[in-house]
C-alpha cells in the first residue's frame, strides 16, 4: 500500500481502520493486542517516511508488527493470522519480501540493523535501516552490545524506541517537551555539531566547564545514556501524533548517523477496555470485543498453574526457596510468588543470561533457586547453564514451561530443543512429569535435589489426568505403567506418556507402557531388563528427534528395535496445536497407524 501522498488526516483515518482490522481479527484468532494497537502510528509513519521496497524494516520481537503486515499486501490474508497455513504473528521473509528478517525472540533488532548497515556501506547503496524496538527489549544485554558498536562506527541507522510502559524516565514537564522538539530540529542538530567542533579547540579548563554545562543540560532529558554511547537521541515525543512522528523521522533519516527516537505510546490504544492494562492484554486468546471477556474457557488446570501453586506452597513453608523469571511473571506462574515473597522471587526483565547465572550463588549459599522459563527462551541462557551452573555443580532447578508444540506463536516459540541441548551437559539431570500430580512431585524432587536439574511440562494442560497412580520421583528411576504379554513397548517421556496412552487405545495388539521419567540419568537396570522382554520399542516425546529421548536409548546399545515419534529435523510451523500435530502425523489415530506398519 503506497501512502506517500496521504495527508495527515488520511493517515489518521487509515490508522483507525488498521486498529479496527487488528481488533476484529485478534478477537477471533487470538494474538498480541495491546502493544500492536499502540504501535500503529509508529508503523504508519515508518512507511510514510522510509521506502519499504529498499530500506530494511526491522521489528524487534515483531509481535507489534501487525500494522506493517496490513500495509504490505496482507489485508485480506490477515483473517488467517496465526492459523495453520495462514500468515504468521511475527515477521517472516518467506511470507513477504517486505519482512526483512525472522523475529520472535527479543532484543535482536539493533544487531540486525548494524549488520544491514555494514552490508549497505560495503555495497555503497543509498538505504537506511529502520528499527522498531520496545522499551522492554532494552533490558537485554545484546541491545547494548549492538549500541556499543553502532555508536563507535556511526552507521546511519534510525531506531524508534517504543516506550509503552513508561519504564524509561518520563519527560520532565515543559522544559523536556521543549528540548525534545528543539533536539529534533535542523537548527539544534547544526548547533550541536558546531559546538562539538568548538569544544575541540578550547583550552582544557574551558573545555571542562563547557562539557559540564553540556552534561547538566543532558541530565534533564532521558537520552544521556544513548548520547554517551555516541548515538543521537531525540525525544520523548508523542508516539500517536503522526505529524510529529513524520517530521522527526524525516529529520532522523537525513542525519546520516545513528539516532534513537524515543516515542511514548499507550498500550491498547483505541480499545478502551485494554488501554492501560499492560500485561493482561499483551497476548490474548479469542475474546468478546464488547466486553473483553475470553471466549475460551479451560476445563482442565494448566501445567503452569499447577507448578505455580506447588512452588507457592513450598515457598510458604521453606524460606530457602527462591526463584527468578525473565520478563514472564504471568506466563511462568511466578507472579503470585513475586507479589507475596518479593524478597525471594524476582523478575529480572528480558535478561535470560543474567537470570540463570544469578541463581548460582544463591544455591551455593544454601538456598534452593528455581529458574522458571520457557523452553524456547532458555536457549538464550545456554552458555550460562553450562559455565555458571553445571560446571559449578550447584543445585539450581530449571522449570521448563512451554515444552513441546506451543501452537500459534510458531517456529520461534516451539519448545522442541531443550532435551537435545541440555542432555549433553555434564552434571545435568533431566526428568519430566506426565500429569498434574507428578508435576507436583517434580517440583518437590527439584526442591530437595542439590545438583543441577531441569524438568519440562507443556503449555496448557497435560494429556493425562489421573489415569495412573502417581508416585514421587526417584533419581534415575523409570516406571512401568502397563505390562502386557506382547513384545511391543511404548516408551513415553513427559507429556509423551499421555500421547502413548491415547495411541494404545487405537491398537488391538497387546502393548506395554513405560514412563521413562528420567532421560538423564536413565534407569539402565530396568531398561536392560525390559529389552529382554520387549522386541520393539516406540518412543513418544514432545521433543526433537536429533539428540532426543530415542538417541539416549540408542546409546545404551540394547538388543531392541527402536522407532521414535519425536519431532523431525525441521522448524515447526504455527497454528492450533491440534492442526500442527495433525500435519506432523502426531495425532493418536495417525500414530497408531504408523505403529501398525511396524508390528
From Swiss-Prot:
Cited InterPro entries: Dxylulose-5-P_synthase, THDP-binding, Transketo_C/PFOR_II, Transketolase-like_Pyr-bd, Transketolase_BS, Transketolase_C, Transketolase_CS
Ribonucleoprotein as UniProt keyword: no
Binding-site residues, Mg(2+): 135, 164
Iron listed as a keyword: no
Pfam families: DXP_synthase_N, Transket_pyr, Transketolase_C
UniProt KW keywords: Isoprene biosynthesis, Magnesium, Metal-binding, Thiamine biosynthesis, Thiamine pyrophosphate, Transferase
Cofactor: Mg(2+); thiamine diphosphate
One of the GO BP terms on file: thiamine biosynthetic process
GO CC terms of this entry: cytosol
Function: Catalyzes the acyloin condensation reaction between C atoms 2 and 3 of pyruvate and glyceraldehyde 3-phosphate to yield 1-deoxy-D-xylulose-5-phosphate (DXP).
Protein name in UniProt: 1-deoxy-D-xylulose-5-phosphate synthase
Organism: Nitratiruptor sp. (strain SB155-2)
Gene name linked to the record: dxs
